[in-house]
């Protein structure tokens, strides 16, 4: 928003359609980074969908969007359109799918941190899998009802991983 007029300057939606409950309410870190030898005022976020985003907070330009966990619902984010490229594994409209991350997300309410001296962002990440039974109800606005869904199906609890990842903010790589 423009602080003087209140008008919308730009917006970005990390999970268009959001058929997996990947809300993006996780906090946003503001930073000044040098990207491609150019100083940029950026915002960084690791929402539930498994991608770490770096966006120019002045222009709204998507600078990077890389996986921080092995998400299966999308292969990558198309940097020209800014949209995630959904995979067949992520489409649960016709058959039950096991999808990573589950609705709990790859990163939830746990705070992430950044270190301006090293350029690293630290993300407390999870890798839960979720069972999504077939439904097309989620595709119809206002038609969703609660249903039984499961997370971490068939995964040995000893192998359920929570990890703190250190990601280089300038590149999005971990």
Spell out what each predicted region is.
Residues 22-47, 108-113, 118-125:
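Repeat-blade elements of multi-bladed beta-propeller folds
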Residues 1-24, 31-39, 51-98, 129-174:
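Extracytoplasmic/lumenal domain signature
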Residues 13, 44, 101:
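Glycine- and other small-residue-rich loops at beta-strand/loop junctions that grip anionic moieties
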Residues 85, 94-98, 104-130:
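Long, low-complexity segments enriched in small/aliphatic residues
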């Amino acid at each position: 928003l423009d602080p003087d007029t209140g008008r919308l300057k730009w917006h970005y939606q990390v999970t268009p359609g959001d058929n997996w409950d990947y809300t993006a309410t996780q906090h946003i870190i503001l930073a000044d980074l040098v990207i491609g030898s150019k100083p940029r005022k950026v915002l960084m976020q690791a929402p539930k969908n498994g991608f770490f985003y770096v966006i120019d907070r002045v222009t709204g330009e998507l600078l990077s969007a890389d996986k921080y966990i092995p998400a299966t619902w999308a292969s990558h984010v198309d940097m020209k359109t800014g949209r995630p490229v959904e995979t067949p594994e992520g489409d649960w409209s016709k058959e039950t799918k096991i999808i990573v991350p589950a609705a709990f997300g790859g990163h939830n309410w746990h705070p992430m941190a950044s270190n301006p001296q090293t350029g690293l962002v630290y993300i407390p990440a999870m890798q839960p899998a979720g069972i999504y039974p077939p439904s097309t109800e989620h595709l119809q606005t206002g038609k969703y009802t609660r249903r039984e869904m499961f997370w971490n199906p068939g995964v040995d609890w000893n192998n359920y991983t929570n990890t703190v990842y250190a990601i280089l903010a300038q590149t999005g790589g971990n």
